[in-house]
């Protein structure tokens, strides 16, 4: 746990404003994104709140009264088809071969629109043959929504091709390192592919939604494929619809 790495044997009395501020600085030095730090702080705050409710900490000493969790607005970074193709065609060799699983997992999630948390919870049981075609059926860790994906129809079945690479040890494919380390792998991978765009694993999900909408897939269908409970959540991609309109009208020239 990062907090224990920062300071071993922490007691409730140690959880002061000064310690939390120092922990934030520690995470910054480790290179964590502002919003990633915010996730760790929210997790810590939740435990502090429980401790206060159980009277392990006096309410007067509530550290988060002064400390404000900082976040920045996330832009939905996505890859355009040409950038995705560069990653698909990237050949890793030498000391970079060890990055292959991170690359393949990222590409698979570009085709399936999955979150990191859902990908690492997959097993072979999530893949089902329906009418002799491969479907991926899973329950979202974040929302609890069941998602049903016809992999054979998504992105020309490229996700199935990746699964076939790992068919002898499929469970290992889903056992990635932690999200932050995989994101570090992706920074190296994009540099090797000649891409200047900074991506994270979640970029795969945004890429999936963006390219589906750009290629004319109905937003309600995209909502179902992403496992969004409400179409309003999917409408963050409406800026892509403008691109789609331009794309369609240019065909008429």
Where are these regions (language model features)?
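N-terminal DNA-binding recognition helix of tyrosine site-specific recombinases/integrases
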Residues: 2, 29-63, 117
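Basic, Lys/Arg- and aromatic-enriched nucleic-acid-binding interface segment
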Residues: 34, 38, 57-116
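C-terminal catalytic core of Y-nucleophile DNA break-rejoin enzymes
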Residues: 73, 141-188
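Catalytic-site neighborhood detector that most strongly recognizes the C-terminal catalytic loop/helix
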Residues: 78, 140-144, 226, 230-251
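Short, basic (Lys/Arg/His-rich) helix/loop patches that form interaction surfaces
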Residues: 94-96, 167-172, 176, 184-224
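C-terminal catalytic core of tyrosine-transesterase DNA break-rejoin enzymes
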Residues: 107, 111, 118, 205-229, ...
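Short, polar N-cap/turn motifs at the start of nucleic acid-interacting alpha helices
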Residues: 127-133, 196-197, 217-236, 243
């Amino acid at each position: 746990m990062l907090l224990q790495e920062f300071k071993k044997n922490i007691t409730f009395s140690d959880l002061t404003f000064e310690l939390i501020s120092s922990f934030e600085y520690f995470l910054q030095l480790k290179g964590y994104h502002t919003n990633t730090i915010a996730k760790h702080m929210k997790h810590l705050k939740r435990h502090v709140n429980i401790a206060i409710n159980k009277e392990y900490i006096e309410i007067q000493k509530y550290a988060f009264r002064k400390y404000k969790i900082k976040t920045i607005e996330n832009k939905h970074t996505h890859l355009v088809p040409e950038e995705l193709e560069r990653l698909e065609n990237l050949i890793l060799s030498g000391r970079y071969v060890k990055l292959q699983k991170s690359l393949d997992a990222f590409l698979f999630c570009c085709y399936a629109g999955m979150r990191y948390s859902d990908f690492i919870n997959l097993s072979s049981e999530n893949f089902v043959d329906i009418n002799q075609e491969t479907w991926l059926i899973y329950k979202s860790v974040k929302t609890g929504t069941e998602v049903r994906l016809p992999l054979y129809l998504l992105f020309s079945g490229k996700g199935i091709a990746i699964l076939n690479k790992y068919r002898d040890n499929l469970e290992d494919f889903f056992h990635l390192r932690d999200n932050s380390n995989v994101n570090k792998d992706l920074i190296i991978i994009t540099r090797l592919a000649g891409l200047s765009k900074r991506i994270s694993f979640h970029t795969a999900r945004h890429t999936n939604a963006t390219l589906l909408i750009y290629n004319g897939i109905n937003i309600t269908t995209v909502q179902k494929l992403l496992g969004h409970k409400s179409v309003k959540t999917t409408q963050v991609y409406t800026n892509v619809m403008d691109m789609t309109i331009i794309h369609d009208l240019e065909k008429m020239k």
